[in-house]
Amino acid sequence: MKTPGLRIRQPKARGEWAELRFITRAIELKFRVSKPWGETGPYDCIVDHRGRLSRVQVKCTCKKRLQSYVCSVSNNRGPYSPRDIDFVAALIIPTETWYLLPIAILGRSFDVWLTPQRKNSRYAEYQEAWHLLRR
């Protein structure tokens, strides 16, 4: 069965769906989540764990290239900066896999290649790494 996100064709609507999926999962894991008013800020959500706040930009992808999924970690102004966000939460829609990527590891990258089926892939340690939001 196809995951529901694959049926959403409009990119903005798909992004909103991914944000709701992120918020739902974070709440299930006992985080407090806040959603900023408006869409002009650099992050989509604020995750609170015992008073520690993390600014999270939610991204999603279903673009497969070779064995990996390509996910944008930038916006129309370029790569995100540690001044703007703390994490990119990337959802691979077909596999329903989350990556919690600290902004510090992304450098000036525009895209990341995520390979959930490979345990030794470049970003494997960030696959389902929700614990990073607890630090």
Outline where the language-model segments fall.
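Mixed-charge (Asp/Glu-Lys/Arg
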Residues: M1-G41, I46-R135
